[in-house]
């Protein structure tokens, strides 16, 4: 299992949200580049980055920071937030993003997912952000009537190999992941599943590893010192 430390960008700074609420934003670091360098020093092999401004506006807002980070940190990153067209995907892959994450666009534009998969195969992941079992879109502001399992099956059927699952009600809470929802997802699809939202300590990491989950995205637990990143990475590699 791999540990992906998380950087959420808002107005150029690293922030954390609470349950996806943009009115409950906490700045956790001024510099995304310095934060990423710290993650790399701790042994991170991959970093998860979300452009929250982009997710809200439907277009990349913090791409200059992403570009700088790729040049200075030299570590694989997966990036999502505001990716709505193939031109943006082409640009991100071109500047060195290792994996792009489609969220809202995946639900609203299946044709885009198919084209992205055709061009970039497993460099494309679909982020499924769910609340009460239903997929949320537009920066988590709107809840669809699409069940998260049905959506995951659909994405797998068109060639998606990587699914990032977030339970919005757990995000930023340090209450632990939604293990039941993750297990149900794992029982229904064969994609690589990355768990996100609520991971609070190394016990959660151990349990996810027991579930044979592909990856764990850890954010608030690192910034609040609940998890020692070096320790979590060593644990995940055992």
UniProtKB/Swiss-Prot annotation:
Gene3D superfamilies: Aldolase class I (3.20.20.70). The gene is hisA. Pfam families: His_biosynth (PF00977). Keywords: Amino-acid biosynthesis, Cytoplasm, Histidine biosynthesis, Isomerase. Belongs to the HisA/HisF family. It is found in: Cytoplasm. Coiled coil: none annotated. GO terms for biological process: L-histidine biosynthetic process; L-tryptophan biosynthetic process. Its EC number is 5.3.1.16. The keyword tRNA-binding does not apply. InterPro entries: Aldolase_TIM, His_biosynth, HisA_bact_arch, Isoase_HisA-like, Isoase_HisA-like_bact, RibuloseP-bd_barrel. It comes from the Bacteria. It is an enzyme of class 5 (isomerase). GO terms for cellular component: cytoplasm. Pathway: Amino-acid biosynthesis; L-histidine biosynthesis; L-histidine from 5-phospho-alpha-D-ribose 1-diphosphate: step 4/9. Its main location: cytoplasm. The active site is at residues 8, 129. One of its GO terms (molecular function) is 1-(5-phosphoribosyl)-5-[(5-phosphoribosylamino)methylideneamino]imidazole-4-carboxamide isomerase activity. This is 1-(5-phosphoribosyl)-5-[(5-phosphoribosylamino)methylideneamino] imidazole-4-carboxamide isomerase. It comes from Clostridium novyi (strain NT).
């Amino acid at each position: 299992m791999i540990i992906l430390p998380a950087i959420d960008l808002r107005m150029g700074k690293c922030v954390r949200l609470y349950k996806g609420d943009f009115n409950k934003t906490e700045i956790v670091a001024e510099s995304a580049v310095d934060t990423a360098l710290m993650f790399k020093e701790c042994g991170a092999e991959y970093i998860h980055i979300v452009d929250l401004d982009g997710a809200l506006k439907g277009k990349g807002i913090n791409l200059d920071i992403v570009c700088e980070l790729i040049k200075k940190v030299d570590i694989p990153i997966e990036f999502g937030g505001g990716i709505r067209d193939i031109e943006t995907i082409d640009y991100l892959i071109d500047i060195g993003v290792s994996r792009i994450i489609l969220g809202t666009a995946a639900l609203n534009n299946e044709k885009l997912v198919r084209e992205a998969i055709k061009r970039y195969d497993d460099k494309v992941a679909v982020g499924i952000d769910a609340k009460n079992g239903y997929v949320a879109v537009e920066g988590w502001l709107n809840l669809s009537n699409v069940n998260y399992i049905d959506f995951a099956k659909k994405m797998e059927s068109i060639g998606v190999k990587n699914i990032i699952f977030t339970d919005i009600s757990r995000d930023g809470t340090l209450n632990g992941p939604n293990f039941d929802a993750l297990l149900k997802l794992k029982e229904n699809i064969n994609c690589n599943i990355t768990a996100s939202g609520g991971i609070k300590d190394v016990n959660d990491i151990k349990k996810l590893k027991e579930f044979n989950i592909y990856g764990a995205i850890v954010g608030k637990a690192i910034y609040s010192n609940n998890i020692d990143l070096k320790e979590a990475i060593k644990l995940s590699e055992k």
